[in-house]
From Swiss-Prot:
Modification after translation (UniProt): Sumoylation is essential for high-affinity binding to snoRNAs.
Phosphoserine: residues carrying this PTM: S109, S304, S351, S484, S503, S515
Compositional bias segments (type: Basic residues): 486-496, 518-530
InterPro entries, per the entry: Nop56/Nop58 (IPR045056), NOP58/56_N (IPR012974), Nop_C (IPR042239), Nop_dom (IPR002687), Nop_dom_sf (IPR036070), NOSIC (IPR012976)
Cell location: Nucleus, Nucleolus; Nucleus, Nucleoplasm
Compositional bias per record (Basic and acidic residues), positions renumbered to this chain: 414-427
Protein name as it appears in the record: Nucleolar protein 58
Example GO molecular function: snoRNA binding
Residues in cross-link Glycyl lysine isopeptide (Lys-Gly) (interchain with G-Cter in SUMO1): K467
Primary gene name: NOP58
Gene Ontology biological process: ribosomal small subunit biogenesis
Length: 530
């Protein structure tokens, strides 16, 4: 049986001399305690040495992926096929590939693993012609090269640095806000007017660090930090400040907090520049499309640039809005149109009605840029610049769609109404004051004429009745002299007679005119009786 043993120096093929001892797996390690004992079990048949580390790296990457290298294929065809013996391999996947392509019987078992372990322990004595120093140097170089290959390592392409940098940048922003708020509240007890005069946080902390107590503002020179007008205003406010007095220990603690704020803000600017440079080195096209901050947040959200490249455009569009997405799906409402990509400059400068369209188009182009940066060999940002120019042109067409110029026959079709200045004097309509519902019905001309005739007839009848009533009243007045009881009854009848024509007929003007005449006649009769 032959044994294929891979080393960092080259391929070694051993011949098993005593196969009976392989049956005792538990005691096989005793046979490899010394080089002499090991030479009695296995013997080197062929050794194929690598020329350099690059060749060794290519061979081992092929073995890791379960593939056969060209160099290994030549060795197996030359040595193993001629021997017509089974081949022991350390990897079952590699054995399957060898059997498929070269038609060689391969063995992989716990016995083979124990045999490989014994050969590895006595490798210096079993492989002559290779110095231990050379073996150690090749092992170290191959280990570094293999690690770089497996981790996709590159000095310029480390997306882990971007993930950590953007996370630290967000943490620094939160800490700075907390520290600045605490500093303003703390020093506000001593000099509250300063917070209203100086709005910039960093300038505020620098002024505190330079002056300290409120009494020192009169003699302090703040021309390096503030304009002349603001400096004069600060000094004037310090003289008439309504703040309380504080001790020197309080001022020392406030100043120490100010130094912390200044140092953190300076480190934040340095970290932001580092992030910009790292993004331009790793993902230049993504940086051009969405900016360094949004691009870094997308990479951090996905975990790495390779993971982000595996996402679809629709996923990248709503990346960062997972809570809103699942909430919308649960409540069966409209899903969100954008996530982290909303903070890109192209989406921000768009009108609200076009934000959804632009975010969808930007996500599609950003995915192309991500995949180009992740898998492309070229590190230029030409593709990103070209796609951004297309998106900006598309954005201009969307914004100017309603303001297009009319040319040709369109001018004749587009009729514009003439402008007329209406300066008519309007009167107040009191009919709108009533809250009662009014329903105005139009009447026909014939009906109006008939109604006029009826009213005229009623008026004539009313005049005749008034004359009759006057005559009857005269007779009744004469009868009133006999008895007072009869007079009262007659008076009741008079009232009854007066009310009947009013209830039956329409209101007329003649009755209203006749009533004062009746009263005069009654008075005359009463005077005559007396």
């Amino acid at each position: 049986m032959l044994v294929l043993f891979e080393t960092s120096v080259g391929y070694a093929i051993f011949k098993v001399l005593n196969e009976k001892k392989l049956q005792e797996v538990d005691s096989l390690w005793k046979e490899f305690e010394t080089p002499e004992k090991a030479n009695k079990i296995v013997k080197l048949k062929h050794f194929e040495k690598f020329q350099d580390t690059a060749e060794a790296l290519a061979a081992f990457t092929a073995l890791m992926e379960g593939k056969i290298n060209k160099q290994l294929k030549k060795v197996l065809k030359k040595i193993v096929k001629e021997a017509h013996e089974p081949l022991a391999v350390a990897d079952a996947k590699l054995g399957g590939v060898i059997k498929e392509k070269l038609n060689l019987s391969c063995i992989h078992s716990p016995v083979v693993n124990e045999l490989m372990r014994g050969i590895r322990s006595q490798m210096d004595g079993l492989i002559p012609g290779v110095e231990p120093r050379e073996m150690a140097a090749m092992c170290l170089g191959l280990a570094h090269s293999l690690s770089r290959y497996r981790l996709k390592f590159s000095a310029d392409k480390v997306d882990t640095m971007i993930v950590q940098a953007i996370s630290l940048l967000d943490d620094l922003d939160k800490e700075l806000n907390n520290y600045i708020m605490r500093c303003r509240e703390w020093y506000g007890w001593h000099f509250p007017e300063l917070g209203k005069i100086i709005s910039d946080n960093l300038t505020y902390c620098k002024c505190l660090q330079k002056v300290g107590d409120r009494k020192n503002y009169a003699s302090a020179k703040l021309s390096e930090l503030l304009p002349e007008e603001v400096e004069a205003e600060v000094k004037a406010a310090a003289e008439i400040s309504m703040g309380t007095e504080v001790s020197e220990e309080d001022i020392c603690n406030i100043l120490h907090l100010c130094t912390q704020v200044i140092e953190i803000s300076e480190y934040r600017t340095q970290l932001y520049e580092y992030l910009q440079n790292r993004m331009m080195a790793i993902a230049p096209n993504v940086t051009v499309m969405v900016g360094e901050l949004v691009g870094a947040r997308l990479i951090a959200h996905a975990g790495s640039l390779l993971n982000l490249a595996k996402h679809a455009a629709s996923t990248v569009q709503i990346l960062g809005a997972e809570k809103a997405l699942f909430r919308a799906l649960k409540s069966r409402r409209d899903t969100p149109k954008y996530g982290l990509i909303y903070h890109a400059s192209l989406v921000g400068q768009t009108s609200p009605k076009h934000k959804g369209k632009i975010s969808r188009m930007l996500a599609a182009k950003t995915v192309l840029a991500i995949r180009y940066d992740a898998f492309g060999e070229d590190s230029s940002s030409a593709m990103g610049v070209e796609n951004r120019a297309k998106l900006e042109a598309r954005l201009r067409t969307l914004e100017d769609r309603g303001i297009r110029k009319i040319s040709g026959t369109g001018k004749a079709l587009a009729k514009t109404e003439k402008y007329e200045h209406k300066s008519e004097v309007k009167t107040y309509d009191p009919s709108g004051d009533s809250t009662l519902p009014t329903c105005s019905k139009k009447r026909k001309i014939e009906q109006v004429d008939k109604e006029d005739e009826i009213t005229e007839k009623k008026a004539k009848k009313a005049k005749i009745k008034v004359k009759v009533e006057e005559e009857e009243e005269e007779e009744k007045v004469a009868e009133e002299e006999e008895t007072s009881v009869k007079k009262k009854k007659k008076k009741g009848k008079k009232k009854h007679i007066k009310e009947e024509p009013l209830s039956e007929e329409e209101p007329c003007t003649s009755t209203a005119i006749a009533s004062p005449e009746k009263k005069k006649k009654k008075k005359k009769k009463r005077d005559n009786e007396d």
